């Protein structure tokens, strides 16, 4: 399964366009970020010692859009112009814009949640939802996926290259899952997301020259939610639900542990702290790069476990 996915990646024009497009747009996004004030200044609890632009979402969004449009123009089987794709692109635009505003001016969790709910509404309107569930439940589950995934990726974006690399590893897993499930929009979007993350990682790995920012982490989280929802549409076997959650095991577990930890300490679950899994790794002597690479290894293990679950179902819809 994974070998088929690797062959699909290496032979995919949209993947390579996403890699090149995002890599080339990232320095431009950095300059734009400095000009519009989307800059992360050094401070307590931060590892960088100089102001760094946090406008990476602009580069990711630009690279993704170029790759998707290029795939459509080239007649890529995995990426085509459809109402579902329009819904995905619209939702992606919403979370990117809301996130960028937060990176520039700062905003409240409520405003960010409203943006994420609006993006989830775009998916529901174009039919990206678990159709086999009763309509009210299917409509409720989509925002849960979007809010959960977006905030999980935001929380794990604490070290240079961490969120981007973990997302790339998960995206490769979703390429395989989409192919096994026979859902072209999942495998196609996963290919493009993988390429964009790798292109951005060239500038974001330690020492980072640019950060994802809320625009980038929310965009990645939204697209991962789309992939998870796309896998479970029209599938009754519960293993199709479980496999995507296992693939994203690291950010999900880190988020769950953060909520529990903060409640125990009588803190707001929205309060930042240094108790994340990756922070503990740094404290125990792994260092910045070592902690990131260790998290990558955990991400690979999660993807492997998710693919084992999918393999136990067999190819094609259940």
Summary of predicted features, one role per range:
Residues 150-151, 160-164:
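PRPP/pyrophosphate-binding module of the type I phosphoribosyltransferase fold
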Residues 86-116:
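Hydrophobic alpha-helical hairpins/lids featuring a short glycine-rich hinge
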């Amino acid at each position: 399964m994974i070998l088929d996915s690797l062959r699909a990646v290496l032979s995919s024009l949209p993947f390579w366009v996403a890699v090149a497009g995002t890599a080339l747009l990232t320095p431009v996004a950095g300059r734009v970020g400095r000009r519009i004030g989307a800059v992360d200044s050094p401070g307590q609890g931060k590892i960088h010692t100089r102001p760094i632009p946090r406008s990476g979402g602009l580069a990711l969004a630009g690279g993704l859009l170029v790759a998707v449009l290029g795939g459509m123009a080239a007649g890529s089987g995995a990426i085509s112009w459809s109402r579902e794709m329009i819904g995905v692109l619209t939702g992606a635009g919403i979370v990117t814009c809301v996130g960028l505003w937060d990176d520039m001016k700062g905003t409240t969790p409520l405003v960010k949640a409203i943006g994420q709910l609006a993006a989830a509404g775009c998916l529901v309107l174009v039919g990206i939802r678990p159709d086999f569930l009763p309509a009210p439940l299917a409509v409720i589950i989509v925002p849960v996926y979007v809010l959960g995934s977006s905030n999980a990726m935001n929380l794990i974006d604490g070290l240079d290259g961490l969120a981007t690399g973990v997302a790339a590893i998960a995206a490769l897993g979703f390429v395989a899952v989409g192919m096994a499930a026979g859902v072209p929009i999942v495998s196609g979007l996963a290919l493009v997301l993988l390429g964009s993350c790798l292109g951005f990682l060239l500038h974001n790995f330690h020492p980072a020259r640019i950060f994802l920012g809320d625009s980038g982490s929310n965009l990645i989280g939204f697209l991962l939610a789309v992939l998870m929802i796309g896998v479970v549409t029209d599938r009754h076997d519960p293993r199709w639900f479980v496999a995507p959650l296992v693939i994203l095991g690291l950010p999900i577990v880190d988020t769950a542990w953060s909520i529990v930890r903060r409640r125990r300490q009588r803190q707001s679950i929205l309060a930042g702290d240094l108790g994340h899994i990756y922070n503990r790794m740094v404290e125990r002597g792994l260092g910045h790069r070592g902690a990131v690479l260790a998290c990558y290894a955990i991400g690979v293990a999660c993807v492997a476990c998710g693919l084992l679950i999918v393999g136990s179902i067999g190819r094609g819809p259940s």
